[in-house]
A protein has these predicted regions:
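Beta-rich ligand-recognition domains in immune and ubiquitin systems
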Residues: 1-222
Length: 222
C-alpha cells in the first residue's frame, strides 16, 4: 500500500459502539449479490478523534478529504493517527455482519482495522493493510491492489468510483467489491478479493487518504 510512517497495538481509552445490523444468524449462505449484501447495510459516521491532522471531515461525518497539506487544528489524542493519513468510523462490527459503500476520488485506500491496530509511529506500520490487523483496497493506476500484513494482490479491472465492503466479524470474513451500474439503472457488484481472518475484537471501517483525494460514505438510497 502507499508507504506511511509506522503504527502499535494501542488500547483504546473508550468503549466503542457496535454498528447496528440485523441479528446475527450463524451458518447462513454468504451474500454475493448487491441485493443480498444491502440486507446487512450499516450506517456509518467518521470518528474525528481518530483522524490524522491533515484530514478534514465534513458532510456530517460522511466525508473525509485531504485537499492540501494544511493541518487541521485538533488536539492530540491517544486514538488519533499520528502519521498515517487515516480515519476510522465511530461504529464497529462485533458479533455481527455489515455492508457499506464508499464514493472515492484520487489516491485512497478503503478498508477496515481491528480496534488494537497501532496508530502511532512507535507501533510500526499502521496504514490499512500494512499490518496483520488491517485490510485495504485501492486503485494503483492500472489495476486494484488489496493489502494485508504488508503484502498486496493485484486485481485487473477498470477504475470504479464506488467500493463496497462486506464484513462478517464472527466468521472472520472481509470482502471488497466494485459497485457498478447494471441494467435498468440498477447496481451490481464485482468481487475484488475475499479475506478470511481470526477476528477476536471489534472491526472498524477505515480510510487512508492521499493528496487531492477524498472518500464519501454513501447512504443506502444513493
Amino acid at each position: 500500500m502507499p508507504s506511511s510512517t509506522p503504527s502499535t497495538n494501542g488500547i483504546m481509552p473508550e468503549a466503542k459502539k457496535a454498528a447496528k445490523a440485523p441479528p446475527y444468524e450463524p451458518n447462513i449462505t454468504e451474500p454475493n449479490t448487491r441485493a443480498e449484501l444491502i440486507k446487512y447495510w450499516i450506517n456509518l459516521s467518521l470518528d474525528d478523534r481518530t483522524a490524522q491532522k491533515m484530514l478534514w471531515l465534513s458532510e456530517g461525518g460522511a466525508k473525509v478529504s485531504r485537499m492540501s497539506e494544511e493541518v487541521c487544528p485538533v488536539l492530540d489524542r491517544p486514538e488519533r493517527y499520528e502519521h498515517s493519513p487515516q480515519v476510522l468510523c465511530k461504529q464497529g462490527l462485533l458479533g455481527n455482519r455489515g455492508y457499506w459503500e464508499v464514493d472515492c476520488e484520487g489516491w485512497v485506500v478503503i478498508g477496515a482495522a481491528c480496534e488494537s491496530a497501532g496508530r502511532k509511529a512507535k507501533d510500526g506500520p499502521c496504514g490499512l493493510g500494512e499490518n496483520d490487523l488491517s485490510w485495504g483496497v485501492g486503485w494503483a493506476g492500472c489495476c486494484y491492489h488489496v493489502w494485508h500484513n504488508g503484502e498486496n494482490t493485484e486485481f485487473q479491472a477498470p477504475l470504479c468510483p464506488i467500493i463496497g465492503i462486506y464484513a462478517d466479524q464472527p466468521a472472520g470474513i472481509i470482502k471488497f467489491y466494485l459497485v457498478e451500474e447494471g441494467e435498468n439503472g440498477s447496481k451490481e457488484v464485482k468481487l475484488v478479493h475475499r479475506f478470511t481472518a481470526n477476528l477476536k475484537e471489534m472491526l472498524f471501517p477505515g480510510f487512508w487518504v492521499g493528496r487531492n483525494s477524498y472518500c464519501w460514505i454513501r447512504k443506502m438510497d444513493q
